[in-house]
A protein has these predicted regions:
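Non-catalytic connector elements of ABC transporters
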Residues: 1-72
């Protein structure tokens, strides 16, 4: 997948805490660093985000986007 955003961090999902509407996703990007993002629970399910799965955090000026290769 190619994106125009330059700030992309590959990592592994450490945890996903799902709520009714929003979910907290923690991504380990190495070097002792983690990125935490709130995304919709429907997006977390669609991306199949769960502990140990690879994902990419895309940082934009106003938001953080989490992506995976497994969109349905």
């Amino acid at each position: 997948m190619a994106l125009s955003a330059r700030n992309q961090f590959k990592g592994k999902v450490v945890s996903v805490r799902q709520g009714g509407v929003m979910s907290e996703v923690v991504l380990d990007i190495g070097g002792g660093h983690q990125i935490v993002s709130l995304i919709s629970t429907s997006s977390a399910k669609r991306l199949r985000l769960r502990k140990g799965r690879p994902a990419v955090a895309v940082i934009k000026a106003t938001e953080v986007i989490i992506s995976s290769d497994d969109e349905r």
